[in-house]
Amino acid sequence: MKKILAGACLFGLLLSACTPAAEPGDDGTLHILATTYPVYLFTTAVAEGAEDVEVSLLVNQPTSCLHDYTLTVSDMRAIEKADVLVMNGAGLEDFMGDALAASDAAVIDCSEGIELLPALGHEGHDHDTEYDPHIWMCEESALVMMNNILHGLGALDEKNLDCYRENAAAAAALVPEDDARMENLACPYLITFHDGFQYFALDNGLNLLKSIEEEE
């Protein structure tokens, strides 16, 4: 469990996501497709050991900005095959477009219940999203994401509800305590090379001075 969660920052339990019922695929397996790597980490943590459940990652290739991502043929096939789509939400998956609209899969939106920050604008980037979608960078928001997945999967797959609950509780127990080092920084300012650290800065009492993009 710790190995699965190590790369994701922070997690836990808090709100629920309401989604329609999902039916297992023809092979009797509930195919869950997580759109991004952080969402995949959270989903695999909750679903680990669940019977007849398979979790896959949609965007499994490096990309600096998902707003510029284009679905491949294999991506579209994965979406078509999925019984459940677990999404970051907050506009991050705008690239899915018509493929999402055509999907019959149940959808779990991890951003439900999270207070979103306005998106940071940068010259040369035409981001259509109104809000900053990098919600997993904040401990509290990551906890909500985990709980949304727990309740979403539990509603869709009651057979594995106890497993989901146990896994989510174990994940919550791994959430680290507040880092005192962040409270005593002599220079609590942050300059980053990506515009995804707003939530991290707010969560740790840092002042985000500048987000430098490669084009700059």
Task: List PLM regions with ranges.
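Sec-dependent bacterial lipoprotein signal peptides
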Residues: 1-16
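Extracytoplasmic metal-acquisition and chelation regions
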Residues: 7, 17-216
